[in-house]
């Protein structure tokens, strides 16, 4: 280990200062004069002479060459107990010594310590000297840093990471499942590499591309791929790095960022989580955040202001496009908005193929089957799924990832960590009836999603779980599907009521009832699926804290509000009645399924449907996606 004299100096100076201060304090407190030259109060010289004449003075100690006296006296004014009093003596008082001797007062004179002023002077000067020396040393060190002199005060400089040739290790080959977004950015890269092909027909390079989509869908990964493919200087910064505690820092950093970008154009500037600085300006409460709005105004000016920024492509990512300012979204700033959504089954298969490259998978594993089992999973979810499976494989000391680890990983990603298995008891049987109630309703309703698995293995906060496989296209949902989902959610509570009676129903259906109420209310207020008619009665939820105004929410009369509540109650009551009847009609198969579930703890969807099919006819599930395509 190399020893630096600078490090030694930085260590010894504070230690020396602390040691000196401790020594000086200890020296003062142990000095006898320090303790003697202390008084609880003061007294005038005239009053002191009166005390002396009355015989109340017991002892006098003279200090400062006879100019100060510490008097020990007693008297009614002092509470009839001896106290130490400080008295300032006049320069000429020759009669005082005579009076003290006549009164038989104990007198003592103390010599002045000549070394005290010198040490006091050193003690007063050493701290400022060391402070100035330390600051000079710090500024000297900062002058040797890449930023040059004054680096410590460069608050207004941009914190963007700059790469002349970005080496992110990510290319377009590593991006899968978002083909539309990928094509858009491949075109941007082509624009940078071969601009003449586009300018020949009068095309201009896009000034900005905004990536919009849910978390985990690959927005930042796309930006890394562009950086790796473009071959031009690349700046990357987070939206939260603009605004800090000093006023004006945000706007200054925006100016500095675009100044550097213009010096290195053509180039790409990537702003991640742009909603941190680009939220909509508005009234709000208290007029909004002036510092953030000042930063946003500067960003708008730099992106498409009077001077322009030819040769700079701005790429930004956000999952909160609804709160961005309208001026930021217009063409000329962000010419393109690319939606990076959750992948479909084809996209999920491509993503799984990418993340499975470095995984040792058993030959029996079908990535296509995994893709079909994971609707709604984002790219990050799928990457996490395979990583969890690999970790579980290593924990089990296996050489390859099998379908068992894949199943456990899917369950963990969806519902959380696996808990301890329940012991055989009334609680376990009640949970079994609850879960079978969900599953039997989902199986016997034509418009409900098919059952994927029923389990009593606790995960997260849930003691038991029932998985359904939703259809691939969830953008259009019919009224029959919503009613089927309401009945499926009520299946657990209905099974508890039928089997154990109303007094024995539990709180396990609390979350189910929240979902049921939410779906029924949306049917009435949002989708117009009730007797009130095709009306949208939902408030716009304009939040003033997001820069929106406070007076834009829709209003309706108390009569309509009462009718909404009645319709919600009627929908839920109707679904509950039908659900209870289905449970009663299929009590025999439910009892059999509960016994099997308690024995095996997990029943997959195919086995569940096969057992139910032995007792009753199963409806043919409707694929609304194929119906929509045929029309």
Swiss-Prot record:
Disulfide bridge partners, by residue number: none
E.C. number(s) listed in UniProt: 3.4.24.-
Positions annotated to bind ATP: 213-220
UniProt xrefs under Pfam families: AAA, AAA_lid_3, FtsH_ext, Peptidase_M41
Source organism of this protein record: Guillardia theta
GO BP terms in the entry: protein catabolic process; proteolysis
Bilayer topology: Multi-pass membrane protein
Localization, UniProt: Plastid, Chloroplast thylakoid membrane
Active-site residues per Swiss-Prot or TrEMBL entry: 435
Cellular component, GO, one term: chloroplast thylakoid membrane
Cofactor note: Binds 1 zinc ion per subunit.
Positions annotated to bind Zn(2+): 434, 438, 512
Primary localization class, coarse: plastid
GO MF annotation list: ATP binding; ATP hydrolysis activity; ATP-dependent peptidase activity; metalloendopeptidase activity; zinc ion binding
Stretches assigned to the Lumenal side: 24-118
The entry's keywords: ATP-binding, Chloroplast, Hydrolase, Membrane, Metal-binding, Metalloprotease, Nucleotide-binding, Plastid, Protease, Thylakoid, Transmembrane, Transmembrane helix, Zinc
Family per similarity comment: In the central section; belongs to the AAA ATPase family.
UniProt xrefs under InterPro entries: AAA+_ATPase, AAA_lid_3, ATPase_AAA_core, ATPase_AAA_CS, FtsH, P-loop_NTPase, Pept_M41_FtsH_extracell, Peptidase_M41
Protein name: ATP-dependent zinc metalloprotease FtsH
């Amino acid at each position: 280990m190399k020893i630096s004299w600078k490090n030694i100096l930085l260590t010894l100076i504070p230690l020396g200062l602390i040691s000196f201060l401790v020594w000086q304090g200890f020296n003062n407190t142990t000095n006898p004069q320090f303790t003697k030259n202390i008084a609880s109060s003061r007294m005038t010289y005239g009053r002191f002479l009166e005390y002396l004449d009355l015989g109340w003075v017991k002892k006098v100690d003279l200090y400062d060459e006879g100019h100060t006296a510490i008097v020990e006296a007693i008297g009614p004014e002092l509470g009839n107990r001896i106290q130490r009093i400080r008295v300032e003596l006049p320069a000429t008082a020759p009669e005082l010594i005579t009076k003290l001797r006549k009164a038989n007062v104990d007198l003592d004179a103390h010599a002045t310590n000549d070394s005290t002023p010198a040490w006091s002077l050193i003690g007063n000067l050493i701290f400022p000297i060391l402070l100035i020396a330390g600051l000079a040393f710090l500024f000297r060190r900062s002058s040797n840093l890449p930023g040059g002199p004054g680096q410590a005060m460069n608050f207004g400089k941009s914190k963007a990471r700059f790469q002349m040739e970005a080496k992110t290790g990510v290319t377009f080959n590593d991006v899968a499942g978002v083909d539309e977004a990928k094509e858009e950015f491949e075109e941007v890269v082509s624009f940078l590499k071969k601009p003449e092909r586009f300018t020949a027909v009068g095309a201009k390079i896009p000034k900005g591309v905004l990536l919009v989509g849910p978390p985990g869908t690959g927005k930042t990964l796309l930006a890394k791929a562009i950086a790796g493919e473009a071959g031009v200087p690349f700046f990357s910064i987070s939206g939260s790095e603009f605004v800090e505690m000093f006023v004006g820092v945000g706007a200054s950093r925006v100016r500095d960022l675009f100044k550097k970008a213009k010096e290195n154009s053509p180039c790409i500037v990537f702003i991640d989580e742009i909603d941190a600085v680009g939220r909509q300006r508005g009234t709000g409460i208290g007029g909004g955040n002036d510092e953030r709005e000042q930063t946003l105004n500067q960003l708008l000016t730099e992106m498409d202001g009077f001077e322009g920024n030819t040769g700079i492509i701005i790429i930004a990512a956000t999952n909160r496009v609804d709160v961005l300012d309208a001026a930021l979204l217009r063409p000329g700033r962000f010419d393109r908005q690319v939606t990076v959504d959750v992948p479909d089954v084809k996209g999920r298969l491509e993503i799984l193929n990418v993340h499975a490259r470095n995984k040792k998978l058993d030959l029996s594993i079908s990535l296509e089957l995994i893709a079909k089992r994971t609707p709604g999973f984002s790219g990050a979810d799928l990457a996490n799924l395979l990583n969890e499976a690999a970790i579980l494989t290593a924990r089990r000391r296996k050489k390859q990832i099998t379908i068992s680890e894949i199943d456990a990983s899917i369950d963990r990603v969806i519902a959380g960590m696996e808990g301890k298995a329940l012991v055989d008891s009334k609680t376990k049987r009640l949970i079994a009836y609850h879960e079978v109630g969900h599953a039997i309703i989902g199986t016997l309703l034509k418009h409900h999603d098919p059952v994927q698995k029923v389990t009593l293995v606790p995960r997260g906060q849930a003691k038991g779980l029932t998985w359904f496989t939703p259809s691939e296209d969830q953008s259009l949902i019919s009224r029959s599907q919503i009613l089927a989902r309401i009945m499926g959610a009520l299946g657990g509570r209905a099974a508890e009521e039928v089997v154990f009676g109303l007094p024995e129903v539990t709180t396990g259906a609390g979350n189910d009832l929240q979902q049921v109420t939410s779906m029924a209310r949306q049917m009435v207020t949002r989708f117009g699926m009730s007797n009130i008619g095709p009306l949208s009665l939902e408030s716009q939820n304009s939040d003033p804290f997001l820069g929106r105004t406070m007076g834009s929410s829709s209003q309706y009369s108390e009569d309509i509000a009462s009718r909404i509540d009645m319709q919600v109650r009627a929908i839920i009551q109707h679904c509950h009645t039908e659900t209870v009847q289905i449970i009663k009609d299929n009590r025999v198969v439910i009892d059999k399924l509960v016994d099997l579930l308690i024995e095996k703890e997990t029943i997959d969807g195919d086995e569940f449907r096969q057992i139910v099919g032995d007792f009753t006819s199963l409806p043919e599930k409707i694929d609304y996606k194929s119906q929509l395509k045929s029309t």
